[in-house]
């Protein structure tokens, strides 16, 4: 059995999937709070930038992977309109349920599907835009997930990855203090779950940096891959096109 990382811990691949599932079952009901704590509220601006870059048109087909509470899904559904097709998907049943209920509460009726990004149940060449926000770093086989995202994108379609990344060097010390000291404390204080928040901080550090992820997307067959550093590299939006 192959080994992989769960935060800073080395575990069996099948064990990682179970541990990640446990984290997100635990944080699902407080996921928006978690995002606020992890990003100091900036996740809204990062998502708004991603939505603008996606430029979804009326009638567009969009796949939102690891869609969680549905922030991107909601915006894409509005942009695609009644003639569009926007899928809200997640591998975690708790996250999917919370997101589906919140979308319905906001009057957004769009399909929600429990699925694994490494084995997407969609045909080739189907979507105009495929997005994953703050989900890729939790996947065991990132290369497989990226290849699947490319597969289901139409020729000319785009794959977009919004993810925590490598912060600029002058900010690193302060960012480490926040990630490994402040964040678990906040997780314990507000969500009674310091361990899950500690894992999330560790998973960010183990995630590929901007240039490495760019290379991985190119190796998955995507072209014209570029990235935008946001908030000093705390987050990066990578965009690749399928030609």
From Swiss-Prot:
<dbReference type="GO" id="GO:0032259">
    <property type="term" value="P:methylation"/>
</dbReference>
<dbReference type="GO" id="GO:0008425">
    <property type="term" value="F:2-methoxy-6-polyprenyl-1,4-benzoquinol methyltransferase activity"/>
</dbReference>
<feature type="binding site">
    <location>
        <position position="69"/>
    </location>
    <ligand>
        <name>S-adenosyl-L-methionine</name>
    </ligand>
</feature>
<comment type="pathway">
    <text>Cofactor biosynthesis; ubiquinone biosynthesis.</text>
</comment>
<dbReference type="GO" id="GO:0009060">
    <property type="term" value="P:aerobic respiration"/>
</dbReference>
<feature type="binding site">
    <location>
        <position position="90"/>
    </location>
    <ligand>
        <name>S-adenosyl-L-methionine</name>
    </ligand>
</feature>
<comment type="pathway">
    <text>Quinol/quinone metabolism; menaquinone biosynthesis; menaquinol from 1,4-dihydroxy-2-naphthoate: step 2/2.</text>
</comment>
<dbReference type="GO" id="GO:0043770">
    <property type="term" value="F:demethylmenaquinone methyltransferase activity"/>
</dbReference>
<dbReference type="GO" id="GO:0009234">
    <property type="term" value="P:menaquinone biosynthetic process"/>
</dbReference>
<comment type="similarity">
    <text>Belongs to the class I-like SAM-binding methyltransferase superfamily. MenG/UbiE family.</text>
</comment>
<dbReference type="Pfam" id="PF01209">
    <property type="entry name" value="Ubie_methyltran"/>
</dbReference>
<keyword id="KW-0489">Methyltransferase</keyword>
<dbReference type="InterPro" id="IPR023576">
    <property type="entry name" value="UbiE/COQ5_MeTrFase_CS"/>
</dbReference>
<feature type="binding site">
    <location>
        <begin position="116"/>
        <end position="117"/>
    </location>
    <ligand>
        <name>S-adenosyl-L-methionine</name>
    </ligand>
</feature>
<dbReference type="InterPro" id="IPR004033">
    <property type="entry name" value="UbiE/COQ5_MeTrFase"/>
</dbReference>
<keyword id="KW-0831">Ubiquinone biosynthesis</keyword>
<keyword id="KW-0808">Transferase</keyword>
<dbReference type="InterPro" id="IPR029063">
    <property type="entry name" value="SAM-dependent_MTases_sf"/>
</dbReference>
<keyword id="KW-0949">S-adenosyl-L-methionine</keyword>
<protein>
    <recommendedName>
        <fullName>Ubiquinone/menaquinone biosynthesis C-methyltransferase UbiE</fullName>
        <ecNumber>2.1.1.163</ecNumber>
        <ecNumber>2.1.1.201</ecNumber>
    </recommendedName>
</protein>
<comment type="function">
    <text>Methyltransferase required for the conversion of demethylmenaquinol (DMKH2) to menaquinol (MKH2) and the conversion of 2-polyprenyl-6-methoxy-1,4-benzoquinol (DDMQH2) to 2-polyprenyl-3-methyl-6-methoxy-1,4-benzoquinol (DMQH2).</text>
</comment>
<keyword id="KW-0474">Menaquinone biosynthesis</keyword>
């Amino acid at each position: 059995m192959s080994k992989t990382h769960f935060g800073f811990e080395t575990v069996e691949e099948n064990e990682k999937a179970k541990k990640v599932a446990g984290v997100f079952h635990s944080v699902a009901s407080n996921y928006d709070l978690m995002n606020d704590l992890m990003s100091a509220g900036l996740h809204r601006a990062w998502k708004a930038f991603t939505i603008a870059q996606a430029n979804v048109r009326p009638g567009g087909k969009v796949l939102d992977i690891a869609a969680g509470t549905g922030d991107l899904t909601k915006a894409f559904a509005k942009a695609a309109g009644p003639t569009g097709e926007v899928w809200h998907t997640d591998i975690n049943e708790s996250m999917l349920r919370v997101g589906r209920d919140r979308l319905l509460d906001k009057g957004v009726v769009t399909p929600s599907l429990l699925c694994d990004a490494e084995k997407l149940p969609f045909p080739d060449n189907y979507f105009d835009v495929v997005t994953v926000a703050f989900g890729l770093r939790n996947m065991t086989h990132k290369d497989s997930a990226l290849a699947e995202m490319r597969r289901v994108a139409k020729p000319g379609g785009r794959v977009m990855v919004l993810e925590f990344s490598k912060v600029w060097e002058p900010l690193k010390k302060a960012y480490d203090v926040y990630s490994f000291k402040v964040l678990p404390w906040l997780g314990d204080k507000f969500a009674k779950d310091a361990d899950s928040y500690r894992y999330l901080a560790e998973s960010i550090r183990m995630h590929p940096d901007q240039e490495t992820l760019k290379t991985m997307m190119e190796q998955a067959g995507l072209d014209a891959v570029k990235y935008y550093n946001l908030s000093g590299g705390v987050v990066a939006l990578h965009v690749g096109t399928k030609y």
